[in-house]
Amino acid sequence: NKRKRFVLFYFPYTQSLFGKHGGQDFDQSFKYKYAFSIWPERKNYFREVHSAIAELAVENPDIDFVIKPKSIMMKGESWEYYEQVLNEISFDINKVDNYSIEPDIDVHGLILDSDVFCALQSSTAIEAAISGKPVILPIFENYRSTENYQDFAWKNYLDIFDVANNAQHFKDLIIKLKNCHTVSSHILN
C-alpha cells in the first residue's frame, strides 16, 4: 500500500503577490498603487501555513509531507523566517521522518507520484490540476479581503481548486483530500 504524499510548492512571504517596496512617488490616482503596499499580515499568514503543515506531519505519520522550494528560495529573509517558524513551534525536521525539504526533486515526477498539492501562484498548481490531482490554494479570507488579492493569478479560476479559508480549513482539506485520488469531474470539465 503506497504512502500518501502531500506537497507544498514553497512560496516566500516576500513575493510581490503580498505587495512590494517602492512606488511612493506615484500619483494618488495611479490604479495599481496598492501593489506597492506590503500586506502587514503576510508573515502571520506564512506562519499559519507552515505551522499547519508541521502539525499535520506530527499528527499523521502515515502521510509524507514534502516542501518543494526552488533552490534560490532557500536563501534570504523568507527562508530564514521559515526556519525561525519551525524553531519557534519546536518542530525539528530531523526528528520527523515524514517531513522533508526537496529542492532538487523532479517536479513532474513529484506531481505524478503525489496525492495532494498546495501552491499559490505557481504554474505547478495548474500542472498538478491538469494531472487530475487535488490542489489546495491557501488563500485565506484575510488575504482575499486585501487589495493585493487583485493580482492573484488564479483568482478567476478558483473553481478548479480547493480553496482554504483559514488554517484549520487548510488542515481539514489536506486530510480530506489524502483519500481522494482524482479531482471531481465538475472541476475537470
Question: Positions of the model-derived regions?
Answer:
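Conserved catalytic-core segment of nucleotide-activated headgroup transferases in glycan assembly
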Residues: 1-88
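A generic local structural motif
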Residues: 51-53, 103-106, 123, 148-150
